[in-house]
Amino acid sequence: MGAKSMRSWCLCQICSCGSDYCPYEIVKQPRHVPEEYKPKQGKIDLGTTYKRDLNSYKVQPVAIVRPLERQVKKGKLDTVPTYKDDYRAWDLHKSELYKPEQTYHPPTVKFGNSTTFQDDFVPQEIKPRQSFKPSSVVKRSTAPFNGITSHRLDYIPHQLELKFERPKEVYKPTDQRFEDLTTHRCDFQGLIGETAKLCRPVHTRVTQNALFEGSTEFRESFQPWEIPPPEVKKVPEYVPPTGSMLLNSTSHLDYVPYQANHVVPIRPVSQKRSNNFPFQGKSIMKEDFPAWESCRQGLIKKQQQIPNPSGKFDGLSTFRSHYVPHELIPTESCKPLNIAFKSSVPFDDVTMYSVEYTPKRQEICPASYPSPPGYIFDNTNSQGHKFFRKIIPAVKAF
């Protein structure tokens, strides 16, 4: 009990309204080390359910259902449908009206312009009710305005310390090698393997005073060789032939002429028409597909079992023949009379809320006081948090 009473409490722990909040230090979360990837052993099964469950079938060509020979019927085509033959129009007669003739007689009395609502409504005097709403008039106080706030009362001015001016540091480049490590390189490190061997030849630095050789690998591998001069062929002197030139060719000497006949054309000779009658216009289509000799089809309608009525149509229905008119009796109105209810008893303005409401005591946050009741100021830490200590009640000695 003594150790608990000696403990100091921060102002944010004493506060009950949550206005005084002290930030706490952020604890860094532990870093998750990823596990090393280990590839699975064995081969991948590339089989699928489609390859396993598929059963192939032999596909055969579809047999032709269309008949080989075409049957052409002769006769004229009947374009009259069965609807027009079976359902013919009836001779309709206009039915007489059964509504009684009523001649309108205008009223002789002058129209009063009064409705049933105006006749039944009794005007009543409206009495204004007593208003329980508080008045909106602002009451000005005569006392002077007290502009002292809790901030002005509790504020303690402190003397500002002189700012420490840090001297400007001269930049000195480091001798150590720059480590360009990132979070990705730290977290995802590669597997340890053998270092790659350089295939690049050793770079020999050329001194400035040495002359540039200008030799390449191609020049060293393919060196020039001596080409012997071409041999000059001696051209013999031109000796012209003796005698005259023969202009006969092998075609002139070996050619034998033949007597060939003209080709007879296969196309028939066009003969001009000597007749004067008009063009018939016959074609293979018209000769193969002549007009059908069609006959009118008989009625497919069944014979009527019920005989048709004879005589004039009465137009009476079962409702009209059995209907008996009755006199209308007006229903009695059960609506209460619209008369204001007057009572001499005063109005009882007591509600369930005013009866059952229990006012609660408004608690004041202890942190709003300059020194919370029941606590003694202890100290202030480096972050500016105030700490208080509970007052131990005095125990009377017997």
Curated annotation (Swiss-Prot):
Residues 114-126 are annotated as: Mn 1. Residues 282-296 are annotated as: Mn 4. Residues 350-364 are annotated as: Mn 6. Pfam families: SAXO1-2. It comes from the Eukaryota. One of its GO terms (cellular component) is ciliary basal body. GO terms for molecular function: microtubule binding. Residues 148-162 are annotated as: Mn 2. Residues 248-260 are annotated as: Mn 3. Residues 316-328 are annotated as: Mn 5. PANTHER family: STABILIZER OF AXONEMAL MICROTUBULES 2. Belongs to the FAM154 family. This is Stabilizer of axonemal microtubules 2. It comes from Homo sapiens (Human). The lineage of its organism: Eukaryota, Metazoa, Chordata, Craniata, Vertebrata. The gene is SAXO2.
